[in-house]
Amino acid sequence: MNFKNIYLIFFQFLKARYNFKKIRKKSIVIYNEDSSQLIADFLDSADYYILDTSLKYINFRILLKSFIKYNFKWKPKFYFYTFLSELSPSYIITMVDNDLKFWNIKKYIKNTETILIQNGWRDNLLDIFSELSPREYNSFNVDQMFLFCKKYEDLYKKYIIGKTHTIGSMRSNKFEYSKNTINEVIFISTVKNTNEESIQIKPVQTVFPLLCKIFKEKKIKFKVLGRTLPIDPSEEKFYRNMSNDFTFINKSKEAHKCYKYIDECRLVISIDSTLGYESLSRGNRTAFFTIRGEDLENKSTNFGWPNKLDDLGPFWTNIYNEDYIEKIIDYLL
């Protein structure tokens, strides 16, 4: 553990709110608050526990117990494993499918069944698979994995021993498709932080001014669906610095509204967002300008990865070419 990581952990523990509650056993644990409500909607409210993995709230009694148990080998993950042991659940479920700590739970807690539900489109550039190597094939264990597609089944099974199932997106599946087409185009923002490295924002800076120009000329209303929650004014400002020829829609805490926005528009445009792939699966006309990996020679951000598809397709391009982008838009409109 390097000095930077030690500092970050120390700072997290300093900010945390502590309690001394005695933990009662639960038959089901939802690992990580992210998307926990989606899982909780299917469960008896009295029968599950949501484990906070952000270290915002720390049970001091569990923390002390983990220090005693693991002493000089202690790492933050051992706090979570000790907490899970105390809860002694029959099932541990997560929608944070790219958390290595979850992949490792079975090494520390034997008498429980782990269930992983894929929550987002993955790559090996900025996501979980960039942290793994062939040496880690079959190094992890998750009992049941519910994934977007067959190709993801093949990918996860390289590293994780367990059963896989294709279900698409659980979140998208929950909300009914209701098409009421309006003559508008919506762009799905992938910008979380305008101070991010250029690898995050460069594709948007490259393609967005062109899109504004195209739809202004076509006299079609162009909208941007924001990404940040809580709402960050700098996200809209980032787009306004490139053009004013669009309407900005802040992301809603109500998940169903995102699907309403994409379902009602004539055309949805995405760089490489999960919502873009969900839009396609819902039968919406969806264009993908997956140009993030072009300069980096990284294929995992290409359209449809881990499938191996051509760089140019009827509704996608992995290469920035203004004429081809306009051709895709004309085809889909």
Q: How should each PLM-predicted stretch be described?
A:
Residues 18-29, 87, 177-185:
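A short, charged/proline- and glycine-enriched loop
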Residues 76-78, 227-282, 286:
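Donor nucleotide-activated moiety binding/catalytic core segment of transferases
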Residues 58-64, 124-130, 173-179, 257-260, ...:
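Short, charged, surface-exposed secondary-structure boundary motifs
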Residues 166, 239-243, 274-333:
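Catalytic binding pocket for nucleotide-activated donors in carbohydrate/polymer assembly enzymes
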